[in-house]
């Protein structure tokens, strides 16, 4: 079995060490006998997103989100095609925000999103970040899974009505 991962904007959207997340994905798959191809893509590079099994987009500060947005917008139809063909997406932090309607920072500035989903994110109080281990249970395709991870965010995502 093979797994093709496309890590988008690896050079810009790596705020909290998403390189480690990509490497963990690779190693866990390889331990299960899955051959992994991990490719990167940044602004201006051509990749056929639909050829990948997993689209990975990490976190980035407001500056980096603004930098990549025009490039992401040019890829919107390709991303939609990949979604329609059941490509999996792992979106972290700013990557997640960019797939919603918008992100509003603490000064009221808005970074537009790709609008794939109904949600939007608003920056929270700088002194009230959500930081720590997290475990959630979810059901997908009739199977129940426990997802375990670490959260570190200050934004509040609202209007989550579109099923992922």
Residue ranges and their predicted role:
Residues 25-34, 102-107, 159-164:
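Short charge-dense sequence patches
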Residues 9-10, 41-43, 58-60, 92-95, ...:
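Fold-independent oxyanion-binding glycine-rich loops
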């Amino acid at each position: 079995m093979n797994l093709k991962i496309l890590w988008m904007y690896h050079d810009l959207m790596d705020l909290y060490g998403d390189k480690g997340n990509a490497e963990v994905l690779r190693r866990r798959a390889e331990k299960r006998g899955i051959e992994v191809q991990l490719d990167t893509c940044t602004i201006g590079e051509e990749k056929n997103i639909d050829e990948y099994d997993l689209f990975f987009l990490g976190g980035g500060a407001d500056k980096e989100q603004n930098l990549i947005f025009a490039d992401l917008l040019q890829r919107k139809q390709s991303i939609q095609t990949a979604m329609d063909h059941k490509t999996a997406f792992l979106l972290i932090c700013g990557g997640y925000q960019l797939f919603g309607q918008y992100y509003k920072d603490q000064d009221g500035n808005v970074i537009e999103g790709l609008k794939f989903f109904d949600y939007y994110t608003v920056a929270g109080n700088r002194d009230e970040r959500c930081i720590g281990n997290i475990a959630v249970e979810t059901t997908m395709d009739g199977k129940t899974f426990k997802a375990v991870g670490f959260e570190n965010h200050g934004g509040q995502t609202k209007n989550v009505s579109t099923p992922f």
